[in-house]
């Protein structure tokens, strides 16, 4: 109940109440890795990245936590939000070592590669993703941007068309209609 309250309070931007609810959940569910994972995410989203990463590390080490790859991705997002892109990529790669085609880890790595100016690596990650996972607007957007950066207007147009037809109401489709390609 307290965990849910924390998530709801965060959603409605009642951060003090959210933090109090998360802390109650942590006390009541001492050692529960699912509660720890949620609270670690909250810590990261509220700028307490060091504490969040430390708690994610506890979650990852907990043998009762059945999806450590999720905690690795969450820790990577946390590290990146603190400006630690190299650490973030290490976490994403650890997630992929556990679950090789994990969509969120691949997307994160692809975005990081693109942001580093490695458009060919980003393109390759998009292709790997799409070979085994259902498309999302985010991955198609990354594919579009990577192909444009590489100068392949034909491949970029394929991604653009897919975004417009498969995800017409997405932020990415709206960006394309407005001429935004970042």
Question: PLM ranges: what are they?
Answer:
Residues 3-4, 38, 72-74, 108-109, ...:
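Canonical tetratricopeptide repeat
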Residues 34, 67-70, 104, 138, ...:
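Start-of-helix register in tetratricopeptide repeats
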Residues 133-182:
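Terminal, low-structured helical/coil segments at or just beyond the last alpha-helical repeat
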Residues 11-12, 45-46, 78-82, 115-116, ...:
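Register position in tetratricopeptide repeats
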Residues 28-29, 62-64, 98, 131-133, ...:
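Structural marker of alpha-solenoid helical repeat scaffolds
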